[in-house]
């Protein structure tokens, strides 16, 4: 809170000049008359609209300082990104914001999630995750960035918000070209205001000094402040201006349907003349060959009539898709948790893999990415026999993997994972975890039931795995020594855990 009598650091959006008021070359009556003919013959798809321009504000400043209904925070999937926008928001909002984020279970790319503003002037914070940009996946990145802006605006509409302060969602860390991203941001907001303009009074683009020039350059294309500016901006519009809502359009993916499929066309004779071309190649391509009825295959699976070999082949194809994605995805944020790692071998010479439950913030990470990381690490391990050591030590409700995720993991992984897994050592279980494990292995994945071994102390674990063969997190050793007494004083924990 500001000291008594001191000026507030927050900025009321109603005091900021709108984009429409910043025009320096307003047209007089004679100029409008001179352009009437041009106006009637060719107009921009983004028409001059004084009312819409009055709702838009370009402001150079920190979005966290805006006094409006909601501001936008750009982050990563776990909502823990360290970028200037997020750090400023977290600093001003106070510690309660971090506690509130624990309940959100992260946020997928393109999604938008809502929290309170706490100590901010803004009543709410809308969190979203911009895409990582790679030129070969440009279309996917464009669609994801569009979804960010669209979902933020949709959430604002659903919550009856009167004003929203946007930061630049495409952070430099994610590599999205600023100008390309600005086109998507501006046209998405423009189209939303055209359709749902009555719900929002102000949309503020809060930009840095580096970003301001790009926004100044592109705003006239989507929010022309006069007929003259509209006309002048028309040649500068990109070829792809999206659909009626600003969403990127990929022509090759559009389904083309004849207006009157059953009616003869007026130029049928001209079309008939073109039928002399060689059509013999049609159907020769792989994609044009007849395949089995997919729906029929699914029915057969449900009825248990599809062969075991066909089921295995289908499962292998699915696993290979996950594996390809795991090898191409940036999983550094999951790796940094140090929740899964390879250590030594057990007394039978089998590879030991360690899972640290306390290092898995289930509510803050993208669990699909966690599954991808598991596949990325385990694919080459599972080709031979291995064992898993799971430390349940000092876990909280935010660390517990739900049964749906575990069942999905079990169903997705290749058969070699199940065949070569010889034991799962569940270290420091609680009564609740024992009951949950029994239900899960009895009713969901019965193939695991005989491989689960509950281990109450590390001393019991050492009968199967020598202590020198495991890298222990320090808190596991401290907890076990406190609960079960010291037993192996010469062992030192790994400094990396």
From Swiss-Prot:
Domain Macro: from-to ranges: 43-223
PROSITE patterns reported for this sequence: MACRO (PS51154)
InterPro entries hit by this protein: CRAL-TRIO_dom (IPR001251), CRAL-TRIO_dom_sf (IPR036865), Macro_dom (IPR002589), Macro_dom-like (IPR043472), Macro_GDAP2 (IPR035793)
Membrane spanning residue stretches: none
Compositionally skewed regions (Basic and acidic residues) per UniProt: 253-263
Location of the CRAL-TRIO domain: 333-481
Residues recorded as bearing Phosphoserine in the entry: 280
Taxonomy, superkingdom: Eukaryota
Keywords: Phosphoprotein
SUPFAM superfamilies given in the database record: CRAL/TRIO domain, Macro domain-like
Region annotated Disordered, chain positions: 251-273
Classification via PANTHER family: GANGLIOSIDE INDUCED DIFFERENTIATION ASSOCIATED PROTEIN 2-RELATED, GANGLIOSIDE-INDUCED DIFFERENTIATION-ASSOCIATED PROTEIN 2
Sequence similarity: Belongs to the GDAP2 family.
Name used for this protein in its record: Ganglioside-induced differentiation-associated protein 2
């Amino acid at each position: 809170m500001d000291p008594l009598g001191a000026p507030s650091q927050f900025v009321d959006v109603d005091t900021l000049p709108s984009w429409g008021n910043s025009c320096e070359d307003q047209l007089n009556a004679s100029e409008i008359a001179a352009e009437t003919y041009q106006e009637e013959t060719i107009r921009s798809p983004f028409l001059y609209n004084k009312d819409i321009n009055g709702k838009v504000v370009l402001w150079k400043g920190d979005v966290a300082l805006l006094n409006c209904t909601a501001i936008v925070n750009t982050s990563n999937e776990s909502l823990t990104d360290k970028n200037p926008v997020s750090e400023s928001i977290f600093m001003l909002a106070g510690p309660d914001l971090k506690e509130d984020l624990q309940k959100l279970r992260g946020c997928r790319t393109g999604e938008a999630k809502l929290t309170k503003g706490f100590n901010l002037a803004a009543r709410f914070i809308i969190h979203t995750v911009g895409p990582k940009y790679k030129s070969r996946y440009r279309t996917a990145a464009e669609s994801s960035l569009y979804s960010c802006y669209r979902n933020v605006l949709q959430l604002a509409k659903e919550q009856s918000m009167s004003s929203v302060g946007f930061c630049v969602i495409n952070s430099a860390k994610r590599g999205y070209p600023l100008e390309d991203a600005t086109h998507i941001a501006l046209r998405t907001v423009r189209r939303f205001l055209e359709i749902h303009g009555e719900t929002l009074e102000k949309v503020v683009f809060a930009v840095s000094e580096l970003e301001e020039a790009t926004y100044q350059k592109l705003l006239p294309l989507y929010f022309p402040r006069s007929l003259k500016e509209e006309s002048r901006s028309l040649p500068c519009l990109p070829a792809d201006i999206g659909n009626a809502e600003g969403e990127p359009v990929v022509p090759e993916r559009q389904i083309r349907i004849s207006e009157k499929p059953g009616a003869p066309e007026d130029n049928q004779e001209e079309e008939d003349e073109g039928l002399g071309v060689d059509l013999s190649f049609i159907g020769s391509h792989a994609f044009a060959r007849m395949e089995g009825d997919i729906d029929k295959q699914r029915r057969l699976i449900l009825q248990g009539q599809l062969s075991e070999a066909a089921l295995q082949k289908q499962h292998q194809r699915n696993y290979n898709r996950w594996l390809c994605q795991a090898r191409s995805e940036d999983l550094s944020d999951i790796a940094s948790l140090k929740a899964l790692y390879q250590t030594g071998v057990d007394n039978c010479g089998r590879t030991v893999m360690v899972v640290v439950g306390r290092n898995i913030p289930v509510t803050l990470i993208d669990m699909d990415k966690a599954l991808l990381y598991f596949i990325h690490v385990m694919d080459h391990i599972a080709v031979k026999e291995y064992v898993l050591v799971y430390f349940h030590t000092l876990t909280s409700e935010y660390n517990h993997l739900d049964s749906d995720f575990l069942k999905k993991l079990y169903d997705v992984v290749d058969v070699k994972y199940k065949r070569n897994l010889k034991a799962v050592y569940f270290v420091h279980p609680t009564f609740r975890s024992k009951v949950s494990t029994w239900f899960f292995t009895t009713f969901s994945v019965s193939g695991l039931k005989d491989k689960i071994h509950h281990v109450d102390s590390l001393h019991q674990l050492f009968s199967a795995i020598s202590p020198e063969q495991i890298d222990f997190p320090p808190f596991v050793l401290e907890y076990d020594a406190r609960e079960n007494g010291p037993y192996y004083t010469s062992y030192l924990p790994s400094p990396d855990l």
